[in-house]
Amino acid sequence: MKVLLLTGLGALFFAYYWDDNFDPASLQGARVLLTGASAGVGEELAYHYARLGSHLVLTAHTEALLQKVVGNCRKLGAPKVFYIAADMASPEAPESVVQFALDKLGGLDYLVLNHIGGVPAGTRARTPQATRWLMQVNFLSYVQLTSRALPSLTDSKGSLVVVSSLLGRVPTSFSTPYSAAKFALDSFFGSLRRELDVQDVNVAITMCVLGLRDRASAAEAVRGVTRVKAAPGPKAALAVIRGGATRAAGVFYPWRFHLLCLLRRWLPRPRAWFIRQDLNVTAAAAA
């Protein structure tokens, strides 16, 4: 019975992803602020938006990497592309980034929140200061960016696209503070969606649940701890863009993560078993 149930759910998810009414032309001329744009999924998001003719403001921590991405976006046909280097660990950075984007683009149609800050898997934030840093980068900066951009998104009937993680839906071992920040994101934006709805504010919120990021820093952080393979950056980025453009409530990539999230509620014991299979417990505990 369980196998039949999972098979049926899988068929439904495939049908959904193949029929999402995505119109690439809807992104031509769209004004997009993208964070975490210098590498991995964020870099691929920038390239997809550039190909689709969006106007871009890109931000990340490292200016040299941003400059490379900006140059590539221009080659791919982005009509406008600007960048601002910013450290989201600084409480002042989010507001200055949004103001820069508003000044350059005259408003926003999409705010795509993708930046992350973490610690190596298997370690814990061993001090209150380290935990505060994690929460500032992975949660509070998202709140600040959203609060500052929301008036413009309200005017444009725009979209908030939040790139999160499976760790924000399903608790797992050896990622306590990072997972806490991701759960906070899910709760905050879920509540905000309800508030906007009851106030008849036409701003969509798309929560994107992705797997391991396809970038060197992510691979190094989980080396020896997890057996999970990174999701291909271009494919994950395209799933995020499709979800945002169609104003979907949620995106799961790979799609099986949706099943794992459902297992959390319906079948907690199998869910725990699946998670354990992906962990090298000995290596993580020794970290």
UniProtKB/Swiss-Prot annotation:
Protein origin, superkingdom: Eukaryota
Active site per the UniProt annotation: 178 (proton acceptor)
Keyword Signal: yes
Compartments it resides in: Secreted
Binding site for substrate: 165
Record: residues binding NADP(+): 36-62, 87-88, 114-116, 178-182, 211-217
Its EC number(s): 1.1.1.-
Keywords on record: NADP, Oxidoreductase, Secreted, Signal
A GO term for molecular function: oxidoreductase activity
GO cellular component terms attached to this protein's record: extracellular region; intracellular membrane-bounded organelle
Signal peptide positions (record): 1-15
UniProt catalytic activity: cortisone + NADPH + H(+) = cortisol + NADP(+)
PROSITE patterns membership: ADH_SHORT
PANTHER family named in the record: HYDROXYSTEROID (11-BETA) DEHYDROGENASE 1-LIKE B-RELATED, HYDROXYSTEROID 11-BETA-DEHYDROGENASE 1-LIKE PROTEIN
Family: Belongs to the short-chain dehydrogenases/reductases (SDR) family.
Physiological role: Unidirectional NADP(+)-dependent cortisol dehydrogenase (in vitro).
Name of the protein in its database record: Hydroxysteroid 11-beta-dehydrogenase 1-like protein
Species of provenance: Macaca fascicularis
Name of encoding gene: HSD11B1L
